[in-house]
UniProtKB/Swiss-Prot annotation:
Pathway field: Protein biosynthesis; polypeptide chain elongation
UniProt function note: Involved in peptide bond synthesis. Stimulates efficient translation and peptide-bond synthesis on native or reconstituted 70S ribosomes in vitro. Probably functions indirectly by altering the affinity of the ribosome for aminoacyl-tRNA, thus increasing their reactivity as acceptors for peptidyl transferase.
GO biological process, one term: peptide biosynthetic process
Family: Belongs to the elongation factor P family.
Origin species: Chelativorans sp. (strain BNC1)
Designated name of the protein: Elongation factor P
HAMAP family, sorted: EF_P
Length: 187
């Protein structure tokens, strides 16, 4: 579907220069001299490169509609991650580098959303939060709690994050999967 350059909003996926790009930030600019334009920060969905582009109001771009399907994570096989379509029960195999650092947060039976373009996977979204157990946490040094400080900890999946001083090994905590940061203790 074609849209004008001034209608591009953050989150829109467009076809530009032969690739698929997601709009990260947009800024409508109305200079004193010349026509208005939309300054858009784009991120390539395939390789992650960023690009700043100006779109005049009169320009048209192709807005791409991505299909989103729910898949269940089944298991890890070497460098591949195996998922199952929740509706058709077909299996989908993705490489670990496709998921990136967040692959460590995948748990058996976890539901993820895979974005498809012409039946080809181009993106994956994990749940925003996961609950994990702290495997190792450094002890708190007395007198170090006067200022807000964090200490390093290792989670059960091997990921290192910073946690507040009161968190100790064996506790379950909630972690943000996008920022890979501590959120709170688990209930």
């Amino acid at each position: 579907m074609k849209i004008n350059g001034n209608e591009i909003r953050p989150g829109n996926v467009i076809e530009h220069n032969g690739g698929l790009w997601v709009a990260v930030k947009t800024n409508a600019v109305k200079p004193g001299k010349g026509g208005a334009y939309n300054q858009v920060e784009l991120k390539n969905l395939i390789d992650g490169t960023k690009l700043n582009e100006r779109f005049r109001s009169a320009e048209t771009v192709e807005k791409v509609r991505l299909e989103q399907k729910d898949f269940t994570f089944l298991y890890e096989q070497g460098d591949a991650l195996v998922f199952m379509d929740s509706e058709t029960y077909e299996q989908l195999e993705l490489q670990k580098d496709f998921v990136g650092d967040r692959a460590a947060f995948l748990q058996d039976g976890m539901t993820v959303t895979v974005e498809l373009y012409q039946e080809k996977p181009i993106g994956i979204s994990l749940p925003p939060q996961v609950t994990l157990q702290v495997a190792e946490a450094d002890p708190v040094v007395k007198g170090q709690t006067a200022a807000s400080s964090y200490k390093p900890a290792v989670l059960e999946n091997g990921v290192r994050i910073l946690v507040p001083p009161f968190v100790s090994a064996g506790e379950r905590i909630v972690v943000d999967t996008d920022e890979i940061t501590y959120l709170r203790r688990a209930d």
